[in-house]
């Protein structure tokens, strides 16, 4: 997976057209109304739905006020620079309620659970699970066959552009509600206990816990057994 650097993300956000997408339900005498190409319409004679940007649609609602008896507007973003990721062709399991922005890389057979939030530039390796309510900030990198526990935060770094992202190597287990701050590198096979706040790099095949997180022990057979991942959960 190729890391998307901070300056590229900053330029993308800065130069992207800012959009306020809306969905508008209409009722009235709609048969003769004309809409520009940038407005998507699903209209019958007396009812219909239109999609487009509020800057285009708002003037049309005023212009056609004599023909439109009533309307209802649904809107979930204002001047948004980054759309949500198109999920249709991603070879992963992504559950309802996950919020994943564009320019995120998701490996094969990854699992993204309900309520997870994944920001622009983040990368998730094959067979990794991002559990419920976890937050992956901008440019956070998760390797292969990891588990990022429910409520965990991997701090994002889009600004300042010089900051280093969080890097989680392969086969890492992160317990629920842990926090990994920007620039931390977690080595392969490490275990981070639930609720830990990780402020320094974690060596491979070690376990850390506490606030701030400290070395507890090397990962032994008992710990590896208790933190073993279930491949069946990753089958598509």
From Swiss-Prot:
Record's keyword annotation contains Repeat: yes
InterPro entries with a match to the protein in the record: DapH, DapH_N, Hexapep, Hexapep_transf_CS, Trans_hexapeptide_repeat, Trimer_LpxA-like_sf
Pfam family, one: DapH_N
EC numbers, comma separated: 2.3.1.89
Catalytic activity: (S)-2,3,4,5-tetrahydrodipicolinate + acetyl-CoA + H2O = L-2-acetamido-6-oxoheptanedioate + CoA
GO terms classed as biological process: diaminopimelate biosynthetic process; lysine biosynthetic process via diaminopimelate
Record pathway: Amino-acid biosynthesis; L-lysine biosynthesis via DAP pathway; LL-2,6-diaminopimelate from (S)-tetrahydrodipicolinate (acetylase route): step 1/3
Leading EC class: transferase
Molecular-function GO terms, alphabetical: tetrahydrodipicolinate N-acetyltransferase activity
Keywords, sorted A to Z: Acyltransferase, Amino-acid biosynthesis, Diaminopimelate biosynthesis, Lysine biosynthesis, Repeat, Transferase
Sequence similarity: Belongs to the transferase hexapeptide repeat family. DapH subfamily.
Primary role: Catalyzes the transfer of an acetyl group from acetyl-CoA to tetrahydrodipicolinate.
UniProt name for this protein: 2,3,4,5-tetrahydropyridine-2,6-dicarboxylate N-acetyltransferase
